[in-house]
Amino acid sequence: VYKMVTAIAAVDMGGFDPGYIIEDKGLYTFYESFQPKCHIWSLANPRTHGKIDLMEAIAYSCNYYFYEVGRLTYDSYKKETGNNPFDIVAKSLGLGEPTGIELPEDTGARANAEEKNKQYAGEDAGWFGADVLQAVIGQSLNKFTPLQLACYASALANKGTRYEATLLSRVVSWDYQDLIKESKPVVASTLEISEKALAALDQGMRMTASIGTAEQYLRDYPIPIACKTGTAQWQGTTSTGSFSGSDHASFVLYAPADNPEIAISVYVERGSQGGNLANVCIPILDAYFSSSAKYETVATENIAY
């Protein structure tokens, strides 16, 4: 789901045109010491996405495409400004940042040189090309909460404006006659995104639902959806001590794509692939868009006064 960050940075900070074609060769061999692969490629089954543009790379979640544009964008922007372009975009969109919710929360972390220096020592604390390649597809030290991802999806829907999250709409008197407190939308941050980048994101995220990694469940949904699937690589041992290599699955969407009203984030530990989670969102979307009721009151429990 992080790849929209890389897409924005590539277009607005790296000068890439969304129509720029890259041929996915499966194994990314720019560095001799670290050669990651596209998620559909393996030695046994060396499939690739072929020649694709940015919108198709979002729709099919092509790692290879983002390795290349991510590396080139990082190198040029870092050389010109001394800054990490992806960290700037991710921070503005709320990843690794407080959401504003009225509860204690873990703010997670963004993959960057400073964060790696905190977590590692000696030579291992260095920030290398391999770190960049992992970071631009959302791996490495990136660690975000489901609520941050929902706020991120909302910020994309709002064209770069991120609002603080809140659980509270308003507080009224016991008889609902007096308004005691009402929550107002609070802008947490704003990222200026070009029309070119916004158009590419919109098309790519719509294509994810119609022909891409979520099409199995969302292709025929009656309301246009903009979404992105995610897979967080994980391997370790289960509580019983047995080895398990199932990846974590994540998914974000906003809908309707042309006039957004709702943003959703779903995360399943060891859920394998983010595309599977599109099915989880359908009942939520159905409930939201089929209900015309406006709940102005809260049902009471069986309490005798």
What are the residue ranges of the model-derived segments?
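Beta-lactam-recognizing serine transpeptidase/beta-lactamase-like catalytic domain environment
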Residues: 1, 5-269, 305
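Short, charged, low-complexity patches
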Residues: 149, 273-282
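Short, gly/Ser/Thr-rich active-site loops of penicillin-recognizing serine hydrolases
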Residues: 178-188, 278-305
